[in-house]
Amino acid sequence: RNPCFSAILCGTALLAPPAPAQSADGAGLLASTPQSVEDLQRIERQLQQMLPRVLPALVCIELNNGSGSGILVSEKGLVFSAAHVVDKKGTTLKIILPDGTRLPGKTTAQNSNSDAGIAKITSQLNKKLPCVEKAEKMPRVGDWVFALGHGGGLDRKRGPMVRLGRVVSLKNGVIQTDCKLIRGDSGGPLFNLDGKLIGIHSRVGSGLEDNLHVPMKDFNALTEETAEGKTSLTPSPEQDSQPFSTQPS
């Protein structure tokens, strides 16, 4: 199914007609301010080129009576999500692929301070799964980004929801954007216009600028701490000693 596309840009939807494929030029668009309709259409075309690369890796995560989103980051079924979505380490989950396949999973690590959570598909796989590439650097304020998620819950007829926006703040090491998120989006991915994963949706706010995302550096730290067998998971140095509040979606 086609994704539900919602582009929030100063209250104006990007509804340019489909354009022929062109070479990706996300780097040149990342922090540029559109000066014309043509600029807006370039941004939308770039987004349309990236979606086929990343949508196959988007998953829905079901736990008890709730659900959230996640993104595959390895061909062997490793999933990044929000800690409040995957719950504590060892929790059993259902991970639903884009084609509707439901697979058993388990939470392998989480940090409630940063709200970073990692899960893994536990069933034996007979094929490599689609996955996305993680960005090596933090985004900059003003960068164009897009958010994916199963907002409102999994709906295969509608498809996943896509939101376009910009980074508005990097306060305390947390990414804040104006990508409008709703319940069910938590744990979903945030990408730059090159299609690289830069964050995971954590807090869903009522305002356009109230949406927070966990950056990749917190997942990298969590992965390293887990590999080293550490049991005490602490926030990254760039964050306040007090955790920011998370609002499950």
Model-identified regions with their sequence ranges:
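Catalytic-histidine neighborhood of serine endopeptidases
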Residues: 67, 74-116, 123-126
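Catalytic nucleophile loop of clan PA
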Residues: 71-72, 180-201
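Short conserved beta-strand and strand-loop elements enriched in small hydrophobics
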Residues: 61, 91-99, 145-149
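C-terminal cap/linker of serine protease catalytic domains
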Residues: 25-51, 93, 127-129, 151-154, ...
